[in-house]
Amino acid sequence: MTYLDKILEHKRKEIEALKPQNFKKQFESQAENLPAPRDFAAALRRKAPSEPLRLIAELKKASPSRGVMVHDFKPLEIAERYRTLGASAYSVLTDEEFFQGHANYLKAVRENFDLPVLRKDFIIDESQIYEARLLGADALLLIVAALSPEALLQFRELAESLGMSALVEVHSKPELDIAVACGATIIGVNNRDLRTFKVNIQTSVELFASYPNDVIAVSESGIKTPEDLQQLADAGFDAVLIGEGLITSERLAAYGWNEK
């Protein structure tokens, strides 16, 4: 069983346990009082090749491959640090079992900062999309490897109908083709293979050649040096999603994120 299989197996049980909360019904009763979503797509698009990559700064306490990375995890303090670095958006892990994230982390960041916030989780049921909107998410992650093409299309359309953006994640050319066919306007290449958790940044570089011109291009995971960033910028990416590297690498933190 792969890492992804284990995560999805647990996620199905988790969703079943949460069904009585009926997030769709909650959303329908609260919709008029929810704050309008922020424009995640506009925050990510580079307007010219001379501009620096946009930064989606990720708040991540732990991962299946690394264990706990931030023992004294204070989401608001981390979010403030990322803001001063020049982040364009936040990514907040809400998976509890494998990444020690929490829905309350997303809610707190959204309520205390002005940047768009992405819900980073394994979305496999429409109830999670309504929950994301209730939490204040401006965007959510849809992973091609975790969904059928039909579910991917359905979930993207539902997210957008609720005012959120969908960051559709791929790891291969066939997955990219599926993302494009489903009408994705923001496509991220995960340099980490979710089946093995091995990382190769060249995955992004190789797949970019197959991107449609009008799609916002994001590279995710394994970005460790300014040289990595330059390679991705030269390839044509709009944005990168980085978490651990911003904490562990002063050179990454010093990249000209503020020079927009």
Curated annotation (Swiss-Prot):
Pathway: Amino-acid biosynthesis; L-tryptophan biosynthesis; L-tryptophan from chorismate: step 4/5. GO terms for molecular function: indole-3-glycerol-phosphate synthase activity; phosphoribosylanthranilate isomerase activity. Pfam families: IGPS. It catalyses: 1-(2-carboxyphenylamino)-1-deoxy-D-ribulose 5-phosphate + H(+) = (1S,2R)-1-C-(indol-3-yl)glycerol 3-phosphate + CO2 + H2O. Keywords: Amino-acid biosynthesis, Aromatic amino acid biosynthesis, Decarboxylase, Lyase, Tryptophan biosynthesis. Coiled coil: none annotated. Its EC number is 4.1.1.48. One of its GO terms (biological process) is L-tryptophan biosynthetic process. Belongs to the TrpC family. This is Indole-3-glycerol phosphate synthase. It comes from Chloroherpeton thalassium (strain ATCC 35110 / GB-78).
